Amino acid sequence: DNATSTDKLLPAECKHGLVVVLGESSGNWSSEYSAGYVNDWAVANGYQNTTGTYYDGGAWSYVKNEYAKLLLGYNNTMALKGYIAQNAYSSGIIEALTAYSIQKPASVSDLYIPSISEMELIYSNVGVINASLQAAGGSVLENEAYWTVSENQHSPANAATVNPMTGSLQGGKLKSATARVRFIFAF
């Protein structure tokens, strides 16, 4: 219980665990990033911080910030959807999310894009998840980068991806690039 309790936007009854959907999609994170951070808009509109990584020049690597340690995928997805809608931008992953249709009980959350921490949970359970996906006729998670809904706090042009097979975090993938995405929901 309380597996997703750090995401204050999730309905109270959806704090027990996460479900990975059977199919996957792909697309860009956002077609527009010159206007600034989604995070600036999100915080100004009452959402929790949507960043997840920063670049550590001394270590030549991307490092998780304090928000990357929280399960904030639902919060970040709702913020990205609001930002995209208000500014009339396009987002391949939001369009795919809107188009993705599954039957699910009313007592679960809407579908959303995982944050860094949620993708790390998927990575830590990928063997069981892939076996379950395969048994249910779904597509298994691949050895490739998957979008998270976490921004890079030092570059509005970048968002984080995680490889669910290796756990490898890339904090600086261009938002205009195409990558895979696997939606989840909370119960």
Predicted regions and their residues:
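Ser/Thr/Gly/Pro-rich, low-complexity flexible regions
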Residues: 39, 67, 76-77, 112, ...
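Short, compositionally biased
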Residues: 1-107, 174-187
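C-terminal, surface-exposed recognition/capping segments
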Residues: 98-100, 109-110, 116-187
